[in-house]
Regions:
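Acidic, serine/threonine- and glycine-rich low-complexity intrinsically disordered segments
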Residues: 28, 32-174, 180
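Hydrophobic beta-strand positions in blades of beta-propellers and related beta-sheet-rich domains
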Residues: 15-19, 23-25, 66-72, 194-197
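Post-signal peptide N-terminal segment of secreted/secretory-pathway proteins
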Residues: 1-38
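Generic hydrophobic, helix-prone segments enriched in Leu/Val/Ile
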Residues: 3-7, 46, 128-130, 222
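A broadly tuned "polar low-complexity/structure-edge" signature
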Residues: 3, 52-57, 196-197
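Hydrophilic extracytoplasmic domains
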Residues: 145-249
Length: 249
């Protein structure tokens, strides 16, 4: 059973994760969508969720579909107050301005707001991304840019690859993302609509024959990565199956 293989990985307080995840889902489903004549005016898509933070992309339907990025601390998510980059990263204001410098001259009414940040996946890692919104010919547009800072441990507790991304992309040209187990014994490679799991040893993929393949929906995206041991794999497996997930042997 794939979940049982996780027993040898890093310990996590998974009960806290489940509690925070339930809180975030409740917030998104109950408070983040305002209905007017049965039509949503604000949509929120999850980009990342961890033990303490959630990153979303917000679409304001009644404002020409303006799209912004926001990060919330789960402890006070009900306050609807996104955090600023400088709240989580040293010199955050400077790093935001530095990253956006080349695109600040775009269009009209450029909005520079260091709360307009999010977490996304790139080359097997979580990275911080900033966004600038602007108007052009009355159209709401935006440009994204990378922020030269590593997400803090309070946001992403484990984010390592036991196999270098260059080697992964060379062996799997169609691979779009990858996750390594903390004990370095296996790697999950995302290819098209599949999670493919491979054994690894000493920073190399042991065999190109996958241990297992797991189908995922088309255009699905990874928003969370957690590792567990002890009783937590079984707890999470049972909880996910209750929510409609497949039991994978």
């Amino acid at each position: 059973n794939i979940t049982r293989a996780l027993r040898d990985t890093i310990s996590k307080d998974m009960e806290k994760v489940k509690e925070e995840l339930d809180k975030a889902i409740g917030w998104l489903s109950n408070e983040s969508i305002v209905l007017v004549a049965e039509r949503p005016t604000i949509l929120k898509d999850i980009l990342f969720i961890g033990n303490d933070y959630i990153s979303i992309e917000k679409t304001e339907v009644d404002n020409k579909n303006k799209k912004t990025l926001e990060v919330y601390a789960l402890d006070n998510i009900e306050e609807e107050r996104p955090i600023k980059l400088s709240d989580i990263v040293e010199d955050g204001e400077f790093l935001f301005k530095e990253g956006s410098q080349n695109i600040q001259s775009l269009g009209e009414n450029v909005i520079l707001n260091q709360s307009n940040v999010g977490l996304v996946r790139k080359n097997g890692y979580w990275i911080l991304k900033g966004r600038i919104n602007y108007r052009q010919n009355e159209e709401q547009l935006y440009k994204d840019f990378n922020i030269k800072a590593i997400p803090p441990k309070t946001m992403v507790s484990y984010d390592e690859l036991s196999v270098p991304w260059d080697l992964i992309s060379a062996q799997f040209p169609d691979g779009v993302d990858a996750f390594s187990s903390p004990n370095g014994e296996f790697i999950v490679v995302i290819i098209a609509n599949e999670l493919q799991i491979y054994s690894t040893d000493n920073g190399e993929i042991f065999s190109l024959e996958p241990i297992s393949k797991i189908q995922i929906p088309n255009n699905a995206s990874i928003i969370m990565s957690e590792w567990a041991l002890g009783r937590y794999p079984d707890i999470w497996e049972n909880e996910m199956i209750k929510q409609g997930a497949l039991n994978i042997e």
